[in-house]
Amino acid sequence: MKIDLNADLGEGCANDQALLQLVSSANIACGFHAGDAQTMRQSVRWALEYGVAIGAHPSFPDRENFGRTAMQLPPETVYAQVVYQLGALAAIVQVEGGVMQHVKPHGMLYNQAAVDPLLADAIAQAVKAVDPSLRLVGLAGSELIRAGTRVGLVTRQEVFADRHYQPDGTLVPRSQPDALIESDELALSQTLAMVQQHQVQACDGSWVQVQADTVCVHGDGVQALAFARCLRDRFQQEGISVIAQ
Protein backbone atom coordinates (compact mmCIF):
# COMPACT_ATOMS: atom_id res chain seq x y z
CA MET A 1 0.00 0.00 0.00
CA LYS A 2 1.15 3.55 -0.71
CA ILE A 3 -0.06 7.04 0.15
CA ASP A 4 0.96 10.60 -0.64
CA LEU A 5 1.55 12.95 2.30
CA ASN A 6 1.19 16.63 1.42
CA ALA A 7 1.55 19.96 3.19
CA ASP A 8 0.59 23.54 2.32
CA LEU A 9 3.78 25.60 2.33
CA GLY A 10 5.22 29.00 1.45
CA GLU A 11 2.70 30.67 3.73
CA GLY A 12 5.15 32.42 6.05
CA CYS A 13 5.54 29.65 8.62
CA ALA A 14 8.90 28.78 10.13
CA ASN A 15 8.64 25.00 9.80
CA ASP A 16 8.52 24.68 6.00
CA GLN A 17 12.00 23.24 5.55
CA ALA A 18 11.48 20.69 8.32
CA LEU A 19 8.12 19.63 6.88
CA LEU A 20 9.64 19.15 3.44
CA GLN A 21 11.83 16.41 4.93
CA LEU A 22 8.71 14.50 5.99
CA VAL A 23 6.14 14.94 3.20
CA SER A 24 6.10 13.68 -0.38
CA SER A 25 4.20 16.60 -1.96
CA ALA A 26 4.22 20.36 -1.35
CA ASN A 27 1.44 22.80 -2.22
CA ILE A 28 3.11 26.20 -2.60
CA ALA A 29 1.20 29.44 -2.01
CA CYS A 30 1.15 31.59 -5.16
CA GLY A 31 0.78 35.08 -3.68
CA PHE A 32 -2.99 35.57 -3.51
CA HIS A 33 -3.44 34.49 0.14
CA ALA A 34 0.21 34.31 1.22
CA GLY A 35 3.70 34.22 -0.16
CA ASP A 36 5.50 36.22 -2.82
CA ALA A 37 8.06 35.67 -5.55
CA GLN A 38 10.87 35.11 -3.06
CA THR A 39 9.00 32.64 -0.83
CA MET A 40 7.82 30.75 -3.91
CA ARG A 41 11.40 30.48 -5.17
CA GLN A 42 12.74 29.35 -1.79
CA SER A 43 9.96 26.78 -1.38
CA VAL A 44 10.66 25.39 -4.85
CA ARG A 45 14.38 25.14 -4.12
CA TRP A 46 13.77 23.29 -0.86
CA ALA A 47 11.28 20.94 -2.51
CA LEU A 48 13.80 20.10 -5.22
CA GLU A 49 16.53 19.59 -2.61
CA TYR A 50 14.43 17.06 -0.70
CA GLY A 51 12.86 15.35 -3.71
CA VAL A 52 9.33 16.53 -2.94
CA ALA A 53 6.68 16.84 -5.67
CA ILE A 54 5.86 20.48 -6.37
CA GLY A 55 2.30 21.76 -6.69
CA ALA A 56 0.55 25.12 -6.90
CA HIS A 57 -1.75 26.30 -4.11
CA PRO A 58 -3.94 29.00 -5.72
CA SER A 59 -6.43 31.03 -3.71
CA PHE A 60 -9.07 33.70 -3.83
CA PRO A 61 -7.41 37.18 -3.73
CA ASP A 62 -7.59 37.53 0.06
CA ARG A 63 -4.28 38.19 1.79
CA GLU A 64 -6.00 40.03 4.63
CA ASN A 65 -7.88 36.91 5.75
CA PHE A 66 -5.43 34.25 4.52
CA GLY A 67 -7.79 33.15 1.76
CA ARG A 68 -10.42 31.99 4.23
CA THR A 69 -13.20 34.44 3.34
CA ALA A 70 -16.05 33.24 1.12
CA MET A 71 -16.25 35.06 -2.21
CA GLN A 72 -18.85 34.97 -4.96
CA LEU A 73 -16.82 35.63 -8.10
CA PRO A 74 -17.84 34.93 -11.71
CA PRO A 75 -16.38 31.65 -13.02
CA GLU A 76 -14.44 33.51 -15.72
CA THR A 77 -12.76 35.63 -13.03
CA VAL A 78 -11.76 32.56 -11.04
CA TYR A 79 -10.48 30.93 -14.23
CA ALA A 80 -8.22 33.91 -14.96
CA GLN A 81 -6.98 34.15 -11.37
CA VAL A 82 -6.08 30.46 -11.25
CA VAL A 83 -4.27 30.63 -14.60
CA TYR A 84 -2.34 33.67 -13.33
CA GLN A 85 -1.21 31.92 -10.15
CA LEU A 86 -0.29 28.65 -11.85
CA GLY A 87 1.70 30.53 -14.46
CA ALA A 88 3.69 32.39 -11.83
CA LEU A 89 4.72 29.26 -9.96
CA ALA A 90 5.30 27.23 -13.12
CA ALA A 91 7.78 29.84 -14.36
CA ILE A 92 9.75 29.75 -11.11
CA VAL A 93 9.76 25.95 -11.09
CA GLN A 94 11.00 25.86 -14.67
CA VAL A 95 13.80 28.36 -14.01
CA GLU A 96 14.91 26.31 -10.99
CA GLY A 97 15.04 23.14 -13.10
CA GLY A 98 11.97 21.38 -11.76
CA VAL A 99 8.53 20.31 -12.95
CA MET A 100 5.21 21.40 -11.45
CA GLN A 101 3.14 18.26 -10.93
CA HIS A 102 -0.16 19.15 -9.30
CA VAL A 103 -2.62 21.85 -8.24
CA LYS A 104 -4.53 22.09 -4.97
CA PRO A 105 -6.76 25.12 -4.31
CA HIS A 106 -6.48 26.85 -0.94
CA GLY A 107 -8.93 27.75 1.81
CA MET A 108 -12.36 28.96 0.78
CA LEU A 109 -11.60 28.45 -2.91
CA TYR A 110 -11.05 24.77 -2.07
CA ASN A 111 -14.10 24.52 0.18
CA GLN A 112 -16.47 26.31 -2.18
CA ALA A 113 -15.24 24.29 -5.15
CA ALA A 114 -16.01 21.14 -3.19
CA VAL A 115 -19.74 21.91 -3.39
CA ASP A 116 -20.12 24.38 -6.30
CA PRO A 117 -20.03 22.70 -9.75
CA LEU A 118 -19.54 25.97 -11.67
CA LEU A 119 -16.62 27.08 -9.53
CA ALA A 120 -15.13 23.60 -9.66
CA ASP A 121 -15.39 23.57 -13.45
CA ALA A 122 -13.67 26.96 -13.73
CA ILE A 123 -10.73 25.67 -11.69
CA ALA A 124 -10.51 22.40 -13.62
CA GLN A 125 -10.64 24.21 -16.96
CA ALA A 126 -7.89 26.60 -15.84
CA VAL A 127 -5.64 23.74 -14.77
CA LYS A 128 -6.21 21.93 -18.06
CA ALA A 129 -5.50 25.09 -20.06
CA VAL A 130 -2.17 25.67 -18.30
CA ASP A 131 -1.00 22.04 -18.48
CA PRO A 132 -3.31 19.03 -19.02
CA SER A 133 -0.73 16.74 -17.40
CA LEU A 134 -1.16 18.45 -14.00
CA ARG A 135 -2.94 16.44 -11.32
CA LEU A 136 -5.89 18.16 -9.65
CA VAL A 137 -6.14 17.62 -5.89
CA GLY A 138 -9.49 18.09 -4.18
CA LEU A 139 -11.59 16.98 -1.24
CA ALA A 140 -12.46 13.30 -1.56
CA GLY A 141 -15.83 12.83 -3.26
CA SER A 142 -16.19 16.53 -4.06
CA GLU A 143 -17.46 18.53 -7.03
CA LEU A 144 -13.86 19.52 -7.75
CA ILE A 145 -12.88 15.88 -8.22
CA ARG A 146 -15.87 15.33 -10.50
CA ALA A 147 -15.03 18.45 -12.53
CA GLY A 148 -11.44 17.36 -12.98
CA THR A 149 -12.54 13.94 -14.17
CA ARG A 150 -15.03 15.50 -16.61
CA VAL A 151 -12.36 17.60 -18.32
CA GLY A 152 -9.91 14.71 -18.51
CA LEU A 153 -7.48 15.57 -15.72
CA VAL A 154 -5.90 13.03 -13.42
CA THR A 155 -7.40 13.69 -9.98
CA ARG A 156 -6.17 12.94 -6.48
CA GLN A 157 -8.73 12.63 -3.70
CA GLU A 158 -7.55 14.28 -0.50
CA VAL A 159 -8.25 13.55 3.15
CA PHE A 160 -7.18 15.52 6.22
CA ALA A 161 -5.26 14.31 9.24
CA ASP A 162 -5.96 17.45 11.25
CA ARG A 163 -9.60 18.30 10.47
CA HIS A 164 -12.95 16.96 11.65
CA TYR A 165 -15.56 15.93 9.09
CA GLN A 166 -19.26 16.59 8.70
CA PRO A 167 -21.76 13.80 7.87
CA ASP A 168 -21.83 14.88 4.20
CA GLY A 169 -18.07 14.37 3.86
CA THR A 170 -17.16 18.06 3.93
CA LEU A 171 -14.87 19.58 6.56
CA VAL A 172 -16.21 21.12 9.75
CA PRO A 173 -15.85 24.90 9.18
CA ARG A 174 -12.95 26.56 10.95
CA SER A 175 -15.45 28.94 12.55
CA GLN A 176 -16.66 26.05 14.73
CA PRO A 177 -14.72 25.14 17.89
CA ASP A 178 -14.34 21.45 16.99
CA ALA A 179 -12.98 22.00 13.47
CA LEU A 180 -9.33 21.21 14.18
CA ILE A 181 -7.74 18.04 15.53
CA GLU A 182 -4.97 18.86 17.99
CA SER A 183 -4.25 15.38 19.35
CA ASP A 184 -1.55 13.24 17.73
CA GLU A 185 -3.42 10.06 18.62
CA LEU A 186 -6.71 11.25 17.14
CA ALA A 187 -5.01 12.47 13.98
CA LEU A 188 -3.26 9.13 13.63
CA SER A 189 -6.34 6.98 14.20
CA GLN A 190 -8.45 9.08 11.83
CA THR A 191 -5.81 8.92 9.10
CA LEU A 192 -5.33 5.16 9.36
CA ALA A 193 -9.09 4.63 9.16
CA MET A 194 -9.24 6.72 5.98
CA VAL A 195 -6.20 5.14 4.33
CA GLN A 196 -6.74 1.51 5.32
CA GLN A 197 -10.53 1.27 5.74
CA HIS A 198 -11.67 4.07 3.40
CA GLN A 199 -13.89 5.65 6.02
CA VAL A 200 -13.89 8.54 8.49
CA GLN A 201 -16.02 9.17 11.57
CA ALA A 202 -18.01 12.39 11.26
CA CYS A 203 -18.67 14.81 14.09
CA ASP A 204 -22.09 13.22 14.73
CA GLY A 205 -20.57 9.76 15.14
CA SER A 206 -21.62 8.44 11.73
CA TRP A 207 -19.14 6.90 9.31
CA VAL A 208 -18.49 8.42 5.88
CA GLN A 209 -16.90 6.51 3.00
CA VAL A 210 -13.82 8.24 1.52
CA GLN A 211 -11.10 7.47 -1.00
CA ALA A 212 -7.68 8.54 0.23
CA ASP A 213 -5.06 9.21 -2.44
CA THR A 214 -3.25 11.91 -0.46
CA VAL A 215 -3.25 13.02 3.18
CA CYS A 216 -2.88 16.71 4.10
CA VAL A 217 -1.11 18.13 7.10
CA HIS A 218 -1.58 21.91 7.20
CA GLY A 219 1.80 23.62 7.27
CA ASP A 220 0.42 26.48 9.37
CA GLY A 221 -0.98 24.16 12.04
CA VAL A 222 0.54 24.21 15.51
CA GLN A 223 0.92 20.42 15.44
CA ALA A 224 2.01 20.10 11.80
CA LEU A 225 5.50 18.75 12.43
CA ALA A 226 4.37 16.42 15.20
CA PHE A 227 1.51 15.10 13.06
CA ALA A 228 3.79 14.54 10.08
CA ARG A 229 6.43 12.70 12.12
CA CYS A 230 3.79 10.57 13.82
CA LEU A 231 2.19 9.67 10.50
CA ARG A 232 5.50 8.80 8.83
CA ASP A 233 6.50 6.53 11.71
CA ARG A 234 3.15 4.74 11.80
CA PHE A 235 2.96 4.37 8.03
CA GLN A 236 6.35 2.67 8.14
CA GLN A 237 5.15 0.31 10.88
CA GLU A 238 2.05 -0.54 8.82
CA GLY A 239 4.05 -1.15 5.64
CA ILE A 240 2.56 1.90 3.89
CA SER A 241 4.96 3.66 1.52
CA VAL A 242 4.87 7.47 1.47
CA ILE A 243 5.28 8.55 -2.13
CA ALA A 244 3.93 11.24 -4.45
CA GLN A 245 1.31 9.84 -6.83
UniProtKB/Swiss-Prot annotation:
GO BP annotation list: carbohydrate metabolic process
Presence of the UniProt keyword ATP-binding in the record: yes
Enzyme Commission code: 3.5.2.9
Reactions it catalyzes: 5-oxo-L-proline + ATP + 2 H2O = L-glutamate + ADP + phosphate + H(+)
CDD domains membership: LamB_YcsF_YbgL_like (cd10800)
One Pfam family in the UniProt entry: LamB_YcsF
InterPro entries: Glyco_hydro/deAcase_b/a-brl, LamB/YcsF/PxpA-like
Record key words, sorted: ATP-binding, Hydrolase, Nucleotide-binding
One GO MF term attached to the UniProt entry: 5-oxoprolinase (ATP-hydrolyzing) activity
Domain of life: Bacteria
Annotated family: Belongs to the LamB/PxpA family.
Assembly notes: Forms a complex composed of PxpA, PxpB and PxpC.
Function: Catalyzes the cleavage of 5-oxoproline to form L-glutamate coupled to the hydrolysis of ATP to ADP and inorganic phosphate.
Protein name, per record: 5-oxoprolinase subunit A
Species of origin: Yersinia pestis
Source lineage: Bacteria, Pseudomonadati, Pseudomonadota, Gammaproteobacteria, Enterobacterales
